């Protein structure tokens, strides 16, 4: 997990909805694609900033991480707007959405799904769980046991789920936005390093400014505002944006800097250095 992401947020988005196969057959985004993309991204960020007040940098980083194809971890004390930010992103991105409220008695099957015997067919059938969505909100993920937390590992890394010896692909694109409370809070479990390493970004929203807090007190309920949001992007647009990120050229001088930066993290005796997966995320 890292706290940096690609700064190139102006990705290519289609001006009209097209089949995914047609999108990926395009050789390169045109100037009009970029202009259209800038308008859509600006519109999305403006609407999200009206919901999550006084946090423009957090909003920009969260959106950048999603468009870069990464998973997002929001860490803060309860009531800071973590869930609101995640729900706002889901609605504005126009993706299918599931929310799982993690608890200490939750089992992996509650997330992944399970095989249930169908008497009419005389066979077991797999019933998919809430993870079979494009954007999964794992709310208060560290309130569940490490065994349940580990149920997300394969899905976050390989975008698939294996149950009873069979592998099921997840919808594309697939993102996890997880929220967690500080370890000082009662009833929480630390996330394992293998899971932390699968998050591209870890963000903390912090307290609002006095002006933003006054607006919260005087304004409309955030939950009501969320209901009024309409999708700005859609599945094809998000996939095309991800393709645009992959096409961003990274110069050798930047790669040299990344390797020096990573080497510094691995030289410390106080914490583990950045993994190769983290290096690829930085790129």
Predicted stretch roles:
Residues 63-103:
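Walker A/P-loop
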Residues 60-64, 117-137, 166:
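Conserved alpha-helical scaffold flanking the Walker A/P-loop in AAA+ ATPase domains
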């Amino acid at each position: 997990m890292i706290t940096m992401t690609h700064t190139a947020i102006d990705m290519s988005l289609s001006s009209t909805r097209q089949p995914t196969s047609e999108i990926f057959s395009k050789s390169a985004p045109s100037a009009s694609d970029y202009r259209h993309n800038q308008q859509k991204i600006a519109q999305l960020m403006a609407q999200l900033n009206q919901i999550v007040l006084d946090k423009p940098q957090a909003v920009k980083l969260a959106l950048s991480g999603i468009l870069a194809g990464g998973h997002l971890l929001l860490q803060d004390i309860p009531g800071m707007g973590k869930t609101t930010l995640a729900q706002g992103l889901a609605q504005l991105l126009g993706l299918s959405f599931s929310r799982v409220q993690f608890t200490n008695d939750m089992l992996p099957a509650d997330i992944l799904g399970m095989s249930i015997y169908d008497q009419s067919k005389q066979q077991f059938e797999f019933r998919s769980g809430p993870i079979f969505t494009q954007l999964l909100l794992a709310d208060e993920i560290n309130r569940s046991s490490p065994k349940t937390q580990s149920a997300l590992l394969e899905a976050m890394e390989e975008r698939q789920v294996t149950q009873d010896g069979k592998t099921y692909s997840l919808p594309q694109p697939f993102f996890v936005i997880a929220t967690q409370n500080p370890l000082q809070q009662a009833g929480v479990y630390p996330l394992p390093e293998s899971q932390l390493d699968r998050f591209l970004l870890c963000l903390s929203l912090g307290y609002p400014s006095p002006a933003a807090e006054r607006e919260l007190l005087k304004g409309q309920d955030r939950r009501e505002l969320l209901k009024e949001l309409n999708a700005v992007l859609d599945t094809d647009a998000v996939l095309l944006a991800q393709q645009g990120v992959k096409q961003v050229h990274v110069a050798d001088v930047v790669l040299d800097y990344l390797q020096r930066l990573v080497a510094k993290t691995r030289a410390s005796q106080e914490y583990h250095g950045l993994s190769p997966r983290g290096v690829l995320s930085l790129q």
